[in-house]
Amino acid sequence: LNVHMFCKPTVKLATDRDALQELVKSGHKNVMFGSDSAPHPLKNKFKGAAGIFSAPIILPALAEFFVGDELKMQKFLSDNAINNFGLEVADRKIEIVEEEWIAPRMVGEVVPMWAGKTFNYKVKTGL
């Protein structure tokens, strides 16, 4: 068990994971993003603290997941929730660019999700 990738509820089987990924990629209007980034200091992770610190890498990871289907990514991340819950459209934008980078191994005292992994997309800063 990789304590840095442990969260609840767990996806028990590869078929469960595949079904969730298929649902997300389906573009269904009732399927939308929800983040529960849970940073726990390294010392607590080895005591069974569930939760993954995904904030630094979740958007680049989703860009790789949706590569070639950016419209479905936009719907999953934003449009579906706006439409389903009658939310106002934010006047801020996030730009994701194709640029290789390596996820940090540590952020303060926390190991982020996929620490040390190379990604092909990153969030453009300074907008």
Regions picked out by a protein language model, each given a short descriptive name:
Residues 1-70:
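Active-site-adjacent C-terminal substructures of enzyme catalytic domains
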Residues 59-127:
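Mid-to-C-terminal alpha-helical segments outside catalytic/metal-binding sites
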